[in-house]
Amino acid sequence: MKRIIRHIPSLLLGACFVASGWLKGVDPYGTSLKLSEYFRVWGWSGFVADHPLAWSVCLCAGELCLGLLLLSGVFRKAVAWGTVAVMSAFTALTAWLAFSPVGLSVQDCGCFGEAFTLGHGATLLKNVVLWALAVWHLWVVRTESWHGLKGWRTTACCAVFSLAVPLYSAVWLPPVDFLPFGRGAALSAVPGFGVYDGRYEEVTDSLMEVSGSKPLVAVVSRRELTADDLRKLSGLRAEAGAGRISFCLWTLPGLNGGAGMDVFYTDEVTLKSLLRAEVGFMVVDGGIVRAKRNLSVFRPARFGRSVMVGEMTEEDAGLPGRYGVCVLAGLAVMVWVRRKETEGGR
């Protein structure tokens, strides 16, 4: 019984860190927006404030890795000290959010990404409980001796897996989207969603009707399109010219760059929610989001031929399943490596 009780704090802390790290890591772009909000409130500028996505990836990977290390039981004393330090920082931050007039301007801490939000009071209570668990865990392992580097392979696997989760989502867009504009979402059912023409008349319903007759490819951009962007879109423009798809640009008022495309406008918050990248495109078929691509890494041709819209929708239809298999495979490798090390492998 005592053995079970000794493992309670590490298991609870590990589960919480894994959940928090993965929920943020599956959408590091959204976490970077929250970090930018913090930097703005704190008045930070320069290198740190200029690279929020990089810090977001580090934060998500760090939380996920710490949770996996707690669950695997390697380097227990070092991990326990690290957990106390992290929870002390998080608790201090949420106390500032809860009681500082400036902190109250931040709507939520972003602990669980876009999956769900907690009020400042609930977040502070959660962190106080987790901090107490971290101190309890440190007390439990205080007398344990150092076992050298045994466990380094498990640690390496945890680090690689934890870094891969946010990096994949940052580059190739979230495979699981908790926002209302994810793959499979009906755009017309999203409250407050609107797209406008050059006269600022709403054309959302008209565009959804167009997508009912043939797929609508909407380029989503928060900046002017470059020559390289237009080159990558040439295959899609050719499909539009052949009448197989409809093609347009959704951007900010005042920006153009359509280069022959119909240009429509919406607000910046909507653009950031539609696509977790500065510029990319989404395929809407029958009013339903079927596929998304980050234009910065999009390859317009494979094996000497252009990638067709139908291929992209088929690929994205099976994306959650493939992603789930990869995650389970990564976890299985970590369990296998940990078991080998526990059996005496070095």
Could you say what each language-model-derived stretch is?
Residues 147-176:
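Internal/C-terminal transmembrane anchor helices
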Residues 247-250, 258-280:
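Short, internal strand/loop/helix patches
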Residues 206-226:
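Short active-site neighborhood of thiol/selenol oxidoreductases, capturing the structured segment around
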Residues 294-322:
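Short, aromatic-rich amphipathic segments at membrane interfaces
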Residues 278-293:
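A short, hydrophobic beta-strand/beta-hairpin element that forms part of a small beta-sheet core
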Residues 88-143:
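Membrane-embedded alpha-helical segments of integral membrane proteins
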Residues 315-341:
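Selective detector of the "anchor" transmembrane alpha-helix that sits immediately C-terminal
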